[in-house]
Amino acid sequence: MQTYGNPDVTYGWWVGNSVVTNRAGRFIGSHVGHTGIICFATGASCLWELSRFDSSVPMGHQSSIYLSHLASLGIGFDEAGVWTGAGVATIAIFHLIFSMVYGGAGLAHSLFFDPDLNEGPIGRVDKFKLEWDNPNNLTFILGHHLIFLGVANIWFVEWARVHGIYDPALGEVRTIFPGYGDFGMVWGHQFDFIKIDSLEDVMSGHAFLAFLQISGGAFHIATRQIGEYTKFKGDGLLSAEAVLSWSLAGLFLMGVVAAFWAASNTTVYPTEWYGEPLEFKFGISPYWADTGDTSDCKYFFGHTSRAALVNVQYYFAFFCLQGHLWHALRALGFDFRRIAKAIGGLTESTSS
């Protein structure tokens, strides 16, 4: 974190990042604990939505964001192809169980394991020690992150190929065989990917991402800093604050893209599960508005699940952008206390 040259800076209890900034073991503990919170929220929310589900009202007009995602993945259908919520409770309970496992692992890493990863029962554990100004260390850790993301993409593609996902064009769950190596499709959808209307193209894109991420991960793990570590390459800038700002920038980008995609694409976000496509409007601030009849929407203040999902993602992305700018400027050395002092000076001169 930025200290502005003060080696003895202290942080308030609310600055949680300060506890894990230079403690790789605790950093892992916080990540695993956060995963546990996400798992618990997912399982609990899924059970809550299932308990309130009314089959006489379209799913997209209920408070059913989690059920909508499961239905899109082809989960919850009976043998006749009708969505009944079959197996959804089991998935939710598994999430609750795993949330306890993740929570216990997070506490173990925080309380019992080496907080700095200087030593451990597994060899080479010190390679994952956090050295924020060491490009070799950061690129090594980045490589592993990319490989895990690539594996997740493969898992999704194989799920669609083996189990199948919901195809709104047919109104049923079907298996999707991606075009492995179809780079022409990816190139052709660079600027109109939001309008994709083929699940084969969607899965091909994920297969391409898996290839790209795993290749990039292997490259980052195998390579080291090339040439002299100059200011152009990040010397003096590379820090925990800078990495945090880049992470927030990534969340901003993904949030905005997801918002625009979910608002208009009915292939990946079917109307049956999320409600009608949205319209982008301007008021006090930009927002997404429903375009269909919402008289039967009892939740989300009378809006569809699509409207709730998109607007929350859109505004979370906006605040991630503000966080990115804040931490990026701090990483560059800008002291925001100067603004408060300048305002205080103007106030004093005005009053005098």
From Swiss-Prot:
<dbReference type="GO" id="GO:0009522">
    <property type="term" value="C:photosystem I"/>
</dbReference>
<feature type="transmembrane region" description="Helical">
    <location>
        <begin position="88"/>
        <end position="108"/>
    </location>
</feature>
<dbReference type="GO" id="GO:0009767">
    <property type="term" value="P:photosynthetic electron transport chain"/>
</dbReference>
<dbReference type="GO" id="GO:0009523">
    <property type="term" value="C:photosystem II"/>
</dbReference>
<keyword id="KW-0148">Chlorophyll</keyword>
<feature type="transmembrane region" description="Helical">
    <location>
        <begin position="242"/>
        <end position="262"/>
    </location>
</feature>
<protein>
    <recommendedName>
        <fullName>Divinyl chlorophyll a/b light-harvesting protein PcbH</fullName>
    </recommendedName>
</protein>
<feature type="transmembrane region" description="Helical">
    <location>
        <begin position="309"/>
        <end position="329"/>
    </location>
</feature>
<comment type="subunit">
    <text>The antenna complex consists of divinyl chlorophylls (a and b) and divinyl chlorophyll a/b binding proteins and binds more divinyl chlorophyll b than does the antenna complex from high-light-adapted Prochlorococcus.</text>
</comment>
<dbReference type="InterPro" id="IPR036001">
    <property type="entry name" value="PS_II_antenna-like_sf"/>
</dbReference>
<comment type="function">
    <text>The antenna complex functions as a light receptor, it captures and delivers excitation energy to photosystems II and I. The Prochlorales pcb genes are not related to higher plant LHCs.</text>
</comment>
<keyword id="KW-0812">Transmembrane</keyword>
<feature type="transmembrane region" description="Helical">
    <location>
        <begin position="27"/>
        <end position="47"/>
    </location>
</feature>
<keyword id="KW-0472">Membrane</keyword>
<feature type="transmembrane region" description="Helical">
    <location>
        <begin position="202"/>
        <end position="222"/>
    </location>
</feature>
<dbReference type="Pfam" id="PF00421">
    <property type="entry name" value="PSII"/>
</dbReference>
<keyword id="KW-0603">Photosystem I</keyword>
<dbReference type="GO" id="GO:0016168">
    <property type="term" value="F:chlorophyll binding"/>
</dbReference>
<dbReference type="InterPro" id="IPR000932">
    <property type="entry name" value="PS_antenna-like"/>
</dbReference>
<keyword id="KW-0604">Photosystem II</keyword>
<keyword id="KW-0793">Thylakoid</keyword>
<keyword id="KW-1133">Transmembrane helix</keyword>
<dbReference type="GO" id="GO:0031676">
    <property type="term" value="C:plasma membrane-derived thylakoid membrane"/>
</dbReference>
<keyword id="KW-0602">Photosynthesis</keyword>
<keyword id="KW-0157">Chromophore</keyword>
<comment type="similarity">
    <text>Belongs to the PsbB/PsbC family. IsiA/Pcb subfamily.</text>
</comment>
<feature type="transmembrane region" description="Helical">
    <location>
        <begin position="140"/>
        <end position="160"/>
    </location>
</feature>
